[in-house]
Regions:
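Conserved small-domain helix->loop->beta segment predominantly found in fold-type I
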Residues: 1-47, 66-75
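Short beta-strand-to-loop capping motifs
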Residues: 45-49, 83-85
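PLP-dependent enzyme catalytic core of the Aspartate aminotransferase-like
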Residues: 60-65, 69-121
Length: 121
């Protein structure tokens, strides 16, 4: 295993562990395989609803991820985060989770500006 892949796994492991300990009470659930053989450098968190607004609130805080809308069959919204091991630092992971927790604690996603859907090109 290369050093880059090892760092990728360490970054995603850290993010998943921090989210498990700090975000689960807010209804977010990791849906990324914990077995490193079955995951890349992304982590997806399921949100029962309001995923779009949550991601917009995170982007406003400087945490850039992307959003995948759930479907009518009950699939949840997904907040997806990528970890590029060439330049993402472990402190960046800690900071991102702290921003996520603060956004959730303050219910910032409920603000009107985060609930206006944008056109994506």
């Amino acid at each position: 295993m290369t050093a880059i892949r090892k760092k990728s796994l360490a970054l995603t492991d850290l993010f998943m562990a921090l989210c498990a300990s700090r975000c689960v009470t807010f209804g977010l659930q990791n849906v990324t395989p914990t077995d490193p053989r079955y995951r890349g450098s992304h982590v997806s968190l399921a949100a029962a609803n309001d995923g779009y607004a949550m991601m917009q609130a995170l982007i406003a805080r400087g945490v850039i991820g992307d959003f995948r809308r759930g479907d009518a069959a009950g699939e949840p919204d997904l907040l997806r985060f990528g970890f590029t091991p060439l330049y993402t630092r472990f402190v960046d992971v800690w900071d991102a989770v702290q921003q996520l927790v603060e956004m959730l604690q303050n219910a910032e996603w409920k603000r009107p500006e985060f609930n206006r859907e944008q056109v994506v090109t």
